[in-house]
Amino acid sequence: MNSTTPSIQDQYILASKVRSKLAKCVSVTTKNKDYNLRVLVGHANLLDKITENVETHNAATNALAGDPFSKGPENLSIEHIELSNANASKNDVGKEENAEKTIESEDYCDFYSSDEDPDADTLSSTDSEDDDDYEDYDFEYDYSGGDYNKKIDMYFSFHTAPNYQYLTHTNSHSEQTDELAESTPRYNALPATASTTEEEQDTETLDAVSLHSSAPIFRVLSRRVNGQEDDSENESSSDVDDGSVPLTRFHSCPITA
């Protein structure tokens, strides 16, 4: 035997050899009492181990080869009774739970069902809120705002000045346009004044323009057509007396202050 794990056939062969050796030892010991007992004990122990291994091997093979359902009728009946009792207990528990749920659902439906109150599903005139429904309750509202509004008033009275601009009446857009139309001067309208002479216009322009103003002063002499055109001395004296300058002398140069 070279393998460390011998097969069952090798174990049977080894067991037969051990038996034969033990038998020889027994016969020898009877003849020769000086025989070594250690050899006898060793063979006996080896035989015990071999037989134990063979028995475990046979038990394993029998368990695999046998039918696992091959049980006695008594054991099968006991197991069937136990399973039926367990299933019955589970069914009883499930029925009790279902019964409790149905009772709760019926109570819930009865509480909210409309059979007890026929007017529950219809909205009648009595269901609407009236003032009579609130007669039993006393509602008190504090419109003053308490101390909070007083503090706000005191703050604004100290930190702000009264502005009466927003208290006056504000005109509408049409009224404002009417007022603007009345206040603006009408430049295109002709004044209903009598026609003035050339001398009056000259005096008006001289009065309006002063020496301290920046506007240029133009003085243009107009030669009057008289009967005495040859009298140059009279013209010069009239120019000096009038305070004007002849047109031929400065060609209407502007005199600024």
From Swiss-Prot:
It comes from the Eukaryota. Keywords: Cell wall biogenesis/degradation. One of its GO terms (biological process) is cell wall organization. Residues 88-140, 222-257 are annotated as: Disordered. Signal peptide: none annotated. InterPro entries: Ecm13-like. Residues 105-120, 127-140, 228-242 have a biased composition (Acidic residues). Residues 92-104 have a biased composition (Basic and acidic residues). May be involved in cell wall organization and biogenesis. This is Protein ECM13. It comes from Saccharomyces cerevisiae (strain ATCC 204508 / S288c) (Baker's yeast). The lineage of its organism: Eukaryota, Fungi, Dikarya, Ascomycota, Saccharomycotina. The gene is ECM13.
